């Protein structure tokens, strides 16, 4: 009877007790991404770069890349909402000095014939998979072939943050290659792992809240915590972060990653304008104070003529973490 139940593997019950890297994996998940950390350089192995015909018809390509830590410059937070908008897949993309990006996506490692199910994800049905991929692979797959929305949010991470985070992520990938783990829908998924990486570098930087479980809200949560620059209204930031139309326009572009971030310049310009307005407001306040010293015309006049408060900014809570051994 158990053998006829399509929702469970037909292998021994140990399949759901002991995770393993030895299963009949789908073609695009047969290799594990790992890293050789060599002082100030990291050699990333098995970076995936599939060429897709459809979501399920593709040519699998891999390449290795040697990265100097000093070339790591930025970290972007990628959000791919599900049809149920409260849920989303989240990823990190690391920007390098030459304008290219490496994306890290924490996923289930699918066996042949397997599909993702949140319910099965709480019953040790899937192994956890750290995929390091060319950004063109994971973004084009989701926008064109899965018809999903993709949002690319620039974070406030410094280059030092980016290097520390990248090292911690790659050490985790190496760990999973040696000691596999089961994916869990609630406790060991894409978003919870990102949160753990950030909190390892800066303890309690991201409190565990409902926004982590309902990851469709994770970008707003990161915004509220100051991990995304929050000097623009979130809805405006979200609109500028959506890249689907830019992916379509630049699908085959050699500088794909730079072009899909065209609106990041608008984000920076908007932030600069906001900052300049704050400076102008502050300067006006100083001029008014010089012309009308406090108390000269009485409290009533001061209350009526008080200049507006400069708009505050919470940019900067993502402070440079110390490097910690993995």
Where are these regions (language model features)?
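A short, structured loop/turn motif at beta-sheet edges
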Residues: 37-41, 95-99, 157-162
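Glycine-rich catalytic cores of cysteine/serine-nucleophile enzymes that process amide/ester linkages
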Residues: 42, 47, 52-149
């Amino acid at each position: 009877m158990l053998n006829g139940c399509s929702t469970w593997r037909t292998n021994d019950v140990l399949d759901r007790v002991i995770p393993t890297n030895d299963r009949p994996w789908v073609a695009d998940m047969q290799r594990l991404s790992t890293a050789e950390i060599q002082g100030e350089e990291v050699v990333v192995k098995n970076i995936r770069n599939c060429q897709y015909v459809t979501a399920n018809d593709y040519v699998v390509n891999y390449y290795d890349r040697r990265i100097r830590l000093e070339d790591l410059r930025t970290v972007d937070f990628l959000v791919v909402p599900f049809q149920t908008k409260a849920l989303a897949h989240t990823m990190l993309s690391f920007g390098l000095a030459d304008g290219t990006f490496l994306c890290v996506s924490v996923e289930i490692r699918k066996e042949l014939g397997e599909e993702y199910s949140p319910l099965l994800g709480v019953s040790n049905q899937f192994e956890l998979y750290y995929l390091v991929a060319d950004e063109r692979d994971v973004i084009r797959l989701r926008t064109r072939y899965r018809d999903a929305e993709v949002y690319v949010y620039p974070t406030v991470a410094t280059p030092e943050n980016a290097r520390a985070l990248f090292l911690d992520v790659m050490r985790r990938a190496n760990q999973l290659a040696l000691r596999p783990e089961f994916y869990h829908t609630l406790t060991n998924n894409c978003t919870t792992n990102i949160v753990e990486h950030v909190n390892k570098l800066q303890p309690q930087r991201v409190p565990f809240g409902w926004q982590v479980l309902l990851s469709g809200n994770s970008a707003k949560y990161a915004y509220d915590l100051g991990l995304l620059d929050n000097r623009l209204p979130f809805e405006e930031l979200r609109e500028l972060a959506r890249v689907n139309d830019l992916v379509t326009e630049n699908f085959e572009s050699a500088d794909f990653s730079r072009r899909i971030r065209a609106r990041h310049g608008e984000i920076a310009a908007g932030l600069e304008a906001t900052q300049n307005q704050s400076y102008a407001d502050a300067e006006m306040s100083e001029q008014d104070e010089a012309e009308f010293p406090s108390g000269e015309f009485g409290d009533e006049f001061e209350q009526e003529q008080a200049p507006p408060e400069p708009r505050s900014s919470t940019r900067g809570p993502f402070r440079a973490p110390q490097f910690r051994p993995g």
